[in-house]
A protein has these predicted regions:
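Structural recognition of the conserved hydrophobic beta-strand(s) that form the central parallel beta-sheet
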Residues: 1-4
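A short helix-turn-beta junction within AAA+ P-loop NTPase domains corresponding to the substrate/partner-engaging
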Residues: 10-29
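C-terminal engagement/docking regions of AAA+ P-loop ATPases
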Residues: 105-167
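Short conserved motifs of the RecA-like P-loop NTPase core
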Residues: 53-70, 96-99
Length: 168
């Protein structure tokens, strides 16, 4: 089971004896910054796919996401990104903006506070990344969505034609 608690305190001894393999997965703090970036990008692209729109992330927001202390690891990181995207989408929808942009105000307070003392690795990594007007763009459209609609239409039309031929 995935936990950051002491397994001896939470699992029965008999259960532990029957499954003798222990796997150690490092926390986000113990991983390389590039791996954290990969996770952040994956979660933002997942939200982009869900919304069917590109999501842009400001440089400061990316630095904050790369720098903040995330005690509940990957699950918390994913939840925090979902909340940031939801806040950005709300701003996009209410103010009729052209794009969904994650800016510092869309982040939770503890994430924003990491901007006061960002990690050096995060600053270097963000400087190396290609951006457009201070934003990183993440798009993850279902490129086959429109094709599948057309295919369904053609299959239905083919069935319709077969039925018409049978009735003649």
């Amino acid at each position: 089971c995935a936990t950051n608690k002491d397994i001896n305190a939470s699992l029965l001894d008999t259960f532990i004896r029957r499954i003798p393999v222990k796997i150690y997965l490092p926390s986000l703090e113990d991983r390389f910054i590039e791996e954290r970036l990969t996770l952040i990008e994956r979660f933002i692209k997942d939200e982009s796919l869900r919304l069917d729109k590109p999501v842009l992330v400001s440089k400061n927001s990316m630095i904050a996401l790369l720098s903040y202390n995330c005690p509940y690891n990957v699950g918390q990181l994913k939840s925090d990104i979902k909340l940031a995207v939801a806040n950005a989408y709300s701003d996009y929808f209410i103010h009729h903006k052209k794009q969904i942009k994650i800016n510092s105000p869309d982040l939770q307070k503890d994430i924003k506070s990491s901007l006061l003392s960002p990690k050096e690795d995060a600053l270097r990594l963000v400087d190396l990344m290609a951006d457009t007007d201070g934003y990183f763009c993440y798009v993850n459209y279902d490129k086959y969505k429109n094709y599948s609609r057309a295919l369904k239409f053609l299959l239905n039309y083919k069935t319709y034609l077969k039925e018409e031929v049978l009735w003649i």
